[in-house]
């Protein structure tokens, strides 16, 4: 009604004095986004996470600072339910787990390699899906959208012959340049493989 988007915490307590937000609370709240469905820090049981994917029609946020096994299970459940358009990725940082500068790329690599999900689809979770669901002006290449780009390639000496193949094998891409609002903000770091 007022253009405000709601996200619900999912899983164990995040700060002292808070409590568990279980599947029943998440379903009853019916927030726009099931926040860190794989926990932040502590995840719900896998069966409950899969039930949330099935019984809710809302966005499913999978995060770096959560349970990796449950991250894969949530993504696979959404794919089996034929709703990959609901999956968005995040880091859940900064948080008690700290800040992970490559958290999004690590999530893409994790879900692709260990979850056996095509890398190009996981990149879509991180970019286009997230942009659409969170109403962002980035994440998609279209006239009128922000000119924000990350130029990357396969890491040197990876077993993968292409960027996508190297990600599917579990390697993190080498970032060559970041452009925000059409302006180059940074180039390759000294440590980029």
Language model: regions and residue ranges:
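Extracytoplasmic/secreted proteins and extracellular or luminal domains
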Residues: 27-30, 104, 143, 171
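Active-site core of metal-dependent hydrolases
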Residues: 1-98
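Residues embedded in well-ordered beta-strands within globular domains across many folds
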Residues: 35-38, 123, 151, 179
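C-terminal cap of metal-dependent C-N hydrolases
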Residues: 147-193
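Electropositive phosphate-/nucleotide-binding environments in soluble metabolic enzymes
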Residues: 43, 47, 68, 72, ...
